[in-house]
């Protein structure tokens, strides 16, 4: 037998009742077998159902249902999300110290003006910005604040990969994604994307692609608190190839 560490995120953490747990499995067990074991345990019906449409990571890398697990592996359970190398130059997110560019997570307020100004270079003809802010209502309910959490190691990897792909796909010069974590009030920036390019067309296209893809693939979750309650945002399902599901029961007999 072997033991693996399971890390549920977002609504799964609320339903499963722990930020991490150790699960004992037979040697050579797969991700699918782990999910089957969890689904068969004492979990709420809605949790067991959601386990059939999540993504799973093993040691901060996306995994397939067929991947074999090893003793000591860290397995992330990732419900649908809300929502190259980094250049050497650095930038400030808020009032803290400078950090490597392209992909940043921060608990500090995002200083959008500073980041946009830092993105402009002499060879650029356009800088396109997506500034996602917290609005005061959602689906007819008055919003008090949002709380964001992330599987931080995997989220930064995915964000860096998105900026690298955007540069290659759209021919832009540079891109930066900054996402806020923790509690965010109405009117504050939750996510900032800044794209720099010689021409406006590629800059617009890259910026739209970055936010749309981030909302589907980066493990960041949003909990919305209203005047009359709180709920985890349903979010975007993971695309085919990232989501996993335990195998259906065999009908052979």
Task: Enumerate the predicted regions with their spans.
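N-terminal, polar/charged subdomain of small-to-medium soluble alpha/beta proteins
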Residues: 5-9, 13-15, 74-82, 86-190, ...
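Ubiquitin-like/PB1-type beta-grasp interaction modules and other compact soluble beta-rich domains
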Residues: 1-98
């Amino acid at each position: 037998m072997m033991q693996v560490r399971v890390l549920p995120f977002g609504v799964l953490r609320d339903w499963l009742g722990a930020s991490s747990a150790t699960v004992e499995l037979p040697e050579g067990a797969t991700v699918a077998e782990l999910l089957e074991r969890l689904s068969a345990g004492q979990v709420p019906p809605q949790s067991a159902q959601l386990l059939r449409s999540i993504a799973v990571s093993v040691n901060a890398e996306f995994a397939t249902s067929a991947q074999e697990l090893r003793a000591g592996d860290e397995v992330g359970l990732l419900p649908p999300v809300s929502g190259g190398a980094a250049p050497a130059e650095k930038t400030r997110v808020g009032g803290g110290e400078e950090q490597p560019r392209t992909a940043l997570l921060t608990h500090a307020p995002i200083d959008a003006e500073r980041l946009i100004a830092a993105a402009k270079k002499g060879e650029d003809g356009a800088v396109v910005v997506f500034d996602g802010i917290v609005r005061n209502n959602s689906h007819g309910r008055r919003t008090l604040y949002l709380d964001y959490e992330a599987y931080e190691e995997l989220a930064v990897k995915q964000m860096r990969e998105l900026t690298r792909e955007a540069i290659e796909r759209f021919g832009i010069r540079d891109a930066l994604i900054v996402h806020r974590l923790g509690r965010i009030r109405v009117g504050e920036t939750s996510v900032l994307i800044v794209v720099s390019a010689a021409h406006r067309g590629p800059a617009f296209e890259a910026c739209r692609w970055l936010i749309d893809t981030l909302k589907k693939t980066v493990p960041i979750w949003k909990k919305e608190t209203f005047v009359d309650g709180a709920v985890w945002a349903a979010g975007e399902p993971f695309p085919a190839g990232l989501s996993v599901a335990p195998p259906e029961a065999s009908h052979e007999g």
